Design a protein with these regions (language model features):
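Class I S-adenosyl-L-methionine-dependent methyltransferase catalytic core
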Residues: 1-189
């Protein structure tokens, strides 16, 4: 696993592929950021259920000013910390108001999102596939009006996953094997 483009292009990232940690493949990551490149540079990117942190690190590499890595699994948090350190990226933990470019939030995703008081430009949501966390994430994003008017929500889902998109508009869906990336926009503009 590596950083695909930008400031840290080609740098390798630490990871372990386990039943609960499924790092996004480089080819999917490249397609994701190619699709989103017109939005960069951006202010706020959120990597929800961050795992290894590779998606958030890619966002930093491509010019995101601040990335929030939301991950409550302590082993995964250690991987994110190691990856940020290996790239020389300054980070803070559990400080929503930090000025550092990377902020690791080691709390439940609902708690983390509930504490946000700033608008999000892009959020990448990749929870455990068998969970109802897609619906819960989208619901809190809508209820708290956390997305910028031009904001994009990206869901990484397995084939045939059903979810409630609330008032978010499905812009496009792209398939990569058994994984799908679904792009949603804020339709409450």
């Amino acid at each position: 696993m590596r950083v695909v483009a930008g400031k840290y292009k080609g740098r390798k990232l630490q990871f372990e592929s386990t039943e609960i940690l499924r790092p996004t493949a480089d080819i999917v990551k490249e397609a994701l950021f190619t699709k989103l490149q017109f939005l960069f540079p951006i202010e706020i990117f959120v990597d929800l259920f961050a795992g290894t942190g590779s998606i958030g690190i890619e966002a930093l590499s491509r010019g995101a000013k601040k990335v929030f890595f939301v991950e409550k699994n302590h082993a995964h948090v250690k991987i994110i910390e190691n990856n940020l350190k290996s790239l020389g990226i300054d980070y803070d933990k559990n400080n929503h108001t930090s000025n550092k470019p990377a902020i690791i939030l080691t709390e439940d995703f609902l708690t983390a999102l509930d504490k946000f008081d700033t608008k999000i430009d892009i959020i990448f949501i990749d929870p455990p596939y068998k969970s109802d966390f897609y619906d819960k994430s989208l619901q809190i994003l809508e209820n708290k009006n956390l997305m910028q008017n031009s904001g994009v929500v990206v869901l990484e889902v397995e084939e045939n996953k059903k979810f409630n998109n609330y008032n978010f508009k499905i812009e496009s869906e792209k398939r990569y094997g058994k994984k799908h990336l679904i792009y949603l926009t804020n339709s409450i503009v």
